[in-house]
Amino acid sequence: MAEKVGEGKASEGEKKKNKFGKAAKVSLGVLGGLSLLMGYISAAGMEESEREEEARKPIDTFFTALNARDIEGCRRTLHYPNIQIAGNEIIILDDPESFQIDFQLLANEGWTYSTLDSCSMRQSCNEKVHFEVQLSMHRANDSRYATYQALWIVTKLEGIWGIQCRSIFPSGVRST
C-alpha cells in the first residue's frame, strides 16, 4: 500500500519544528516557574520592607518628641513594660510615668538636640524588629559632643508598633 505524503512519517522540517517546539515549551515552563518564584521572593522582600518602615516610625517619632522636649510624646512611642539597658544597668519601666528625661540636666551639659545618625534593621519577624542605632547629642553650635551605638527592639502589640527595649553601649564618645 502506498503511503500518502504527510501521513505516518514526519518530514525533516516537521521533526525540527517539533524538536524546537518542545524546547520552547520546556523553556517557557521553566521561565514561568522562575517568574512565579521571583514574585514570591519580591513579595516577601516587600513585606519585610513594609514591616521595617512601620516598625521604624516609633523611633523617628521618639527623636522628634525628644528634640521638642515633649516627654508625653516620647512616652507614647514606648511599649510597657519597657526595658532600658545602659552599660550593665537594667531598668524596667512598668508604666509611662516611669519614663523620665531631665531636660534641665541635659541643657546644663550643653545639650540642644539629638540626631538619629543611622538606624538599620538587623533581624525581624512579624511582630518584632531589632534595629542597630547610632545616635548623637549636639550643642547649640551644632557640634556633636556624644555619640552612642545602641540596639533598639521594637514590638507590635495589639496591632501597634512601639519601642520595647533600648540597650545603649557604654562605648559612646562623649566630650565635655
Per-segment meaning from a language model:
Residues 6-18:
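Juxtamembrane low-complexity tails/linkers enriched in Ser/Thr-Pro and polybasic
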Residues 145-176:
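Short beta-strand edge/turn micro-motifs at domain boundaries
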